[in-house]
């Protein structure tokens, strides 16, 4: 071990742990959330059986009405006859995709991102990259890919609200 001029051996610096992100899984979850929001016709955060059927069809999963009703009955944890986005992700096995570490990182970044966002509440890849790179957990390329996966309209940015929702759902 090297000895600096002060005479004491230098201590090894802890390495920032790199985040391993399955971008395909993140993109899948993001597409489920976007489809959910598109089919939640009254914007109450819940989908009914007909809305669920349309949502599934939009994802290429055209199911007969009875299968959709069975799926809703199995996934409806609070038995209100509707599915929340969390219940949808559960029934679609999104929780088994191993994105918990990313979710924890994103949740810890939300307060700083709120202050980093522009006046319109929108985050670009550069804001996310700057913050997560400082946290030492994600490369700029990873941050750009995260934004791309979560960017529903393709403008290269996401709102703080969308970011917060995805962080909570992961």
Swiss-Prot record:
InterPro entries, per the entry: EF-hand-dom_pair, EF_Hand_1_Ca_BS, EF_hand_dom, EF_hand_pair_protein_CML-like
Domain EF-hand: 27-62, 63-98, 138-170
Extent of the signal sequence: none
Residues binding Ca(2+) 3, per UniProt: 151, 153, 155, 162
Binding residues for Ca(2+) 1: 40, 42, 44, 51
Pfam family, one: EF-hand_8
PROSITE patterns for the chain: EF_HAND_1, EF_HAND_2
UniProt keyword list: Calcium, Metal-binding, Repeat
Domain of life, per lineage: Eukaryota
Molecular-function annotations in GO: calcium ion binding
Binding site for Ca(2+) 2: 76, 78, 80, 82, 87
Physiological role: Potential calcium sensor.
The protein's name in its UniProt record: Probable calcium-binding protein CML29
Organism for this UniProt entry: Oryza sativa subsp. japonica
Designated gene of the protein: CML29
